Amino acid sequence: MSSESPQDQPQKEQISNNVGVTTNSTSNEETSRSQDDNVKEVNGNDDTKEEEQEEDAELDDLFGDDNDDDDDDDVKKSETEKSDSDSDEDDEGENINHRSRHRESLGLDDDEAEEQAMYTRKFYGEDANNFSDQDETTHTFKEENVELVRHIIPSKANVNETASHNEIFYARIPNFLTIDPIPFDPPSFEAKVNERASNSASREDQLDDRLIDENTVRWRYSRDKDQHVFKESNTQIVQWSDGTYSLKVGEECTDILVNDTSNTFLTVSHDQQELIQCYEGGEIKKTLMFIPTSTNSKIHQKLSKAVIRRNQRQSKGPGTYIVSMDPEVEKKELERKQSQILRDRRRRQLKEKEKQESPDAAFETGFRKQNSPTTYGASRRNEYEEDDFLVDDDEEEEAAFDDEEDDNEEEEEEEDADEENASRLRNLKREGAAMYREEEEEEKDRSETKRRRVAVIEDDEDED
C-alpha cells in the first residue's frame, strides 16, 4: 500500500510524462543522428563515385573509349554518306549541265546529241559520258622516258609526179619470190646460212635454201657521200620506153603484167572502235603479176628443177590409204576371192592330170571317176579344216548346210564342164595328130619324088 497523496499523483504523472518526452526526444535525436550518418555515408559514396568517374574520364582522354570510338565512327559514316550523296547529286547535275552546254555550243538537237554520244562511247569507252572538266584535276598522270625508233620515209625516184605515179598497186607475191621486211644485217644473215647448212644434210635442201635467198627482196639503211641516211634495196622496178615494167632482183629480171581492177581498197582496221580507215584515198585501181621473162632464164630453170625434186620426194614418201568399205564386207569379199582361187587351182590340177593321162578315153574317164570322190572329199575336208569359226545357232547351221549344198552343186556343174572341155581337148589332139601324120606322109612322098628326079638327072649326065 502506498502512502502517497492525490496531489502527489499528478506530479508523478507529469514527471513520468516529462520522462517519456525526454525519452522520445532522445530517441528522435538518435534516429536523426543515424539518418545524418546514413546521409553522410551516401554522400561519401557519391563523392567516391564522382572521383572514380573523373579518373575514368582522365584515362579516356589519354587512351580513348571504345564506345566513344563507335559513336564517332557512326557519326562519320553518316556524314560521309550524306556528303557522297550530295556529291553524286552535284556530279550528276554538273554532268547534265556540261552535256547541255556542249549540245548548245554545237547546236545539236536531241537525236543528233544521242548519235554524238554513241560515237563518243565508241571512241572513249562507256565512261565517256561521266567525264567532265572538273574530273581532269582528280586524274593522276605518270611520266616515263621511252625511246621511239623514228623510221625514215621511203625514197622516191625523181620523176614528174603525175596521177599515174601516185597510184597504189596490188601485187600477189608468187611462190618464187620472197620479201624480208626486216632490215638486212650481214652478220645475222651469215649466221642463219651457217645454221641451215649444218642442219640440212642433203644437197637438195641446200639448193632450195639458196634459191630462196637469191629471190628475196631485201632492204637496208645506207649513207650517201654527204652522210645522209637513206633506204637501199636490192630490188628495182624498171619502166621501159614502151610502157612495160620489169622487176629486177639482183641480176635476174622478171616481167610485170599490169591489169585494171575495181572495188579494191587499202585500209587499216581498228578492232576496238569497229572502224576501217583508208590509207591515202585507199582505192586500188591496178594489180601487178610477176612472171619469168622466158623459159630459158636462170630463175625459170632453177624453179623447174626445184619443182621436179619436190615431186620426186613426194612420190618417194609413204602413201595414204583411205578406208571406204565396211571391214566385215571386205572380209567376206576376201573369203569369196580365196575360195575362187582354190577352185581355179583345182581346175588347173585336173587339166594337168588329163594331159598326163593316156589317150584312151574309157580308161581316162574310169580312172577319173574312181579318183574324183577321194579328191572331192579331201577338198571338202580341207575346207572344214580351214574354217576358223564355230556356229552354235541352228539357223546358222541350216544356212551353212544350204550353202554347202549350193557349193556342191556348183562344183559338180563345174566338174561336168571340165570333163566336157577335157573330152573336146582330147578330140582336138587326136585330130591334130592325124593331120600331122598325113602331112608328114605327104612330105615324105614329096621328098622321095625329088630324090628320084635328082637321081635320074644325075644318071643322064653321066651317060652324056
Swiss-Prot record:
Major localization class: nucleus
Keyword Transcription attached: yes
Gene Ontology molecular function: any one: transcription coregulator activity
Pfam families: Leo1 (PF04004)
Biological process annotations from GO: chromatin organization; DNA-templated transcription termination; positive regulation of transcription elongation by RNA polymerase I; positive regulation of transcription elongation by RNA polymerase II; regulation of transcription-coupled nucleotide-excision repair; sno(s)RNA transcription; transcription elongation by RNA polymerase II
Annotated keywords: Activator, Nucleus, Phosphoprotein, Transcription, Transcription regulation
Bias-annotated ranges (Polar residues): 1-15, 368-377
Compartment list: Nucleus, Nucleoplasm
Comp. bias regions, Low complexity: 16-29
GO CC list: Cdc73/Paf1 complex; nucleus
Domain of life according to the entry: Eukaryota
Extent of Basic and acidic residues compositional bias: 30-40, 74-85
UniProt region (Disordered), positions on chain: 1-111, 344-464
Compositionally biased region (Acidic residues): 48-73, 384-420
Phosphoprotein is among the record's keywords: yes
Residues recorded with modification Phosphoserine: S105, S132, S188, S358, S372
Annotated InterPro entries: Leo1
Complexes and interactors: Component of the PAF1 complex which consists of at least CDC73, CTR9, LEO1, PAF1 and RTF1.
UniProt-listed PANTHER family: LEO1 PROTEIN, RNA POLYMERASE-ASSOCIATED PROTEIN LEO1
General function of this protein: The PAF1 complex is a multifunctional complex. Involved in transcription initiation via genetic interactions with TATA-binding proteins. Involved in elongation. It regulates 3'-end formation of snR47 by modulating the recruitment or stable association of NRD1 and NAB3 with RNA polymerase II. Also has a role in transcription-coupled histone modification. Required for activation of RAD6 ubiquitin conjugate and the BRE1 ubiquitin ligase which ubiquitinate 'Lys-126' histone H2B.
Note: Present with 1110 molecules/cell in log phase SD medium.
Family to which the UniProt record says this protein belongs: Belongs to the LEO1 family.
Full protein name: RNA polymerase-associated protein LEO1
Gene expressing this chain: LEO1
